[in-house]
């Protein structure tokens, strides 16, 4: 009887834990507390490992949905901005018509690529693996992104300083680079509601290209700078950026993934009430590369 009880009790506990999770699938943090050193204990360990994987996959799906909703806002807004431009003047201006259609097509392609990359990520695949050897004409990509923001935010001034740039291709996929620059400029716009001037500077260094995005906005406190690349940073009130803007803070986290994937570097300097500057260093291409 004693032996039977020692077997049935932990089995009953494990069954109860399973029942709770079955009745409340959102409660994925529950784990078996059985610590016996026998087959039942091994079963409990495997059950907990299984729940760890299920919880991890669930979190990845939630991150995917959050990433998609965040990252698609800007290209959708760009397309809408160009369509509004067409409605106002494009019918009688072939130049505006061609520019807007080209921009809308470009952003639609970029959305497709972003979604595919995010799907790769949620499938536990490297979303950058297929583009390790791709190269990018940074000057052309930056002009494309700035052109989109000029249409989207007509009340802002976007300045491009490229007198120290280089025509050498950089070791990064063009769509991922444009996504990174879009995140930086979008961030600058959001936090510059008064002084609406954004400076983008390109400088060619010895082995890499430096792209700087400077705003004259609200700035970030020194205590908070070390956290800005964390996913959901802005949702944590203890580390909330000094702004009235709301959101979940996905953009800079995705930017950092791009930085790491292509062995880039990024530095941040900021002063409250003065502004923020992001310095993005992208290595020049070396060896066999492809330009999409």
Regions found by a protein language model. Name each.
Residues 1-65, 83-88, 223-224, 231, ...:
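Membrane-proximal HAMP signal-relay module
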Residues 26, 152-161:
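Short conserved segments within the C-terminal catalytic ATPase subdomain
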Residues 37, 132-150:
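A conserved beta-strand-to-alpha-helix junction within the catalytic ATP-binding
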Residues 52-105:
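Membrane-proximal coiled-coil signaling linkers
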Residues 106-111:
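Short alpha-helical segment of the dimerization/phosphotransfer core of two-component systems
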Residues 126-131, 167-172:
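Conserved micro-motifs of the catalytic ATP-binding
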Residues 138, 219-230:
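Short helix N-cap motif at coil->helix boundaries in the Bergerat
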Residues 188-189:
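Short helix-loop "hinge" at the ATP-lid/N-box region of the Bergerat-fold HATPase_c
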């Amino acid at each position: 009887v004693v032996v039977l009880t020692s077997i049935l009790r932990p089995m009953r506990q494990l069954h109860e834990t399973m029942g709770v999770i079955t009745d409340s699938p959102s409660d994925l943090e529950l784990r078996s507390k059985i610590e016996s050193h026998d087959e039942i204990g091994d079963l409990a360990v495997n059950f907990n490992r299984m729940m760890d994987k299920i919880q991890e996959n669930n979190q990845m799906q939630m991150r995917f949905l959050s990433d998609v909703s965040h990252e698609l806002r800007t290209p959708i807004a760009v397309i809408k901005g160009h369509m509004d431009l067409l409605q106002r003047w494009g019918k009688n201006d072939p130049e505006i018509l061609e520019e807007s259609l080209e921009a809308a097509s470009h952003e639609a392609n970029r959305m497709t690529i972003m979604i595919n990359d995010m799907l790769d990520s949620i499938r536990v695949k490297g979303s950058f693996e297929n583009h390790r050897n791709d190269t990018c004409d940074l000057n052309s990509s930056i002009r494309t992104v700035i052109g989109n923001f000029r249409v989207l935010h007509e009340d802002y001034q976007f300045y491009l300083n490229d007198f120290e740039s280089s025509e050498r291709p950089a070791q990064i996929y063009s769509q991922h680079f444009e996504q990174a620059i879009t995140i930086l400029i979008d961030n600058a716009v959001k936090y510059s509601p008064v002084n609406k001037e954004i400076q983008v500077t390109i400088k060619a260094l010895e082995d890499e290209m430096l792209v700087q995005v400077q705003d004259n906005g609200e700035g970030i406190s020194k205590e908070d700078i070390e956290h800005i690349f964390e996913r959901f940073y802005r949702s944590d009130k203890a580390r909330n950026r000094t702004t009235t803007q709301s959101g979940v803070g996905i953009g800079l986290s995705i930017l950092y993934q791009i930085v790491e994937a292509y062995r880039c570097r990024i530095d941040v300097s900021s002063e409250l009430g003065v502004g923020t500057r992001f310095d993005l260093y992208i290595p020049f291409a070396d060896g066999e590369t492809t330009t999409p």
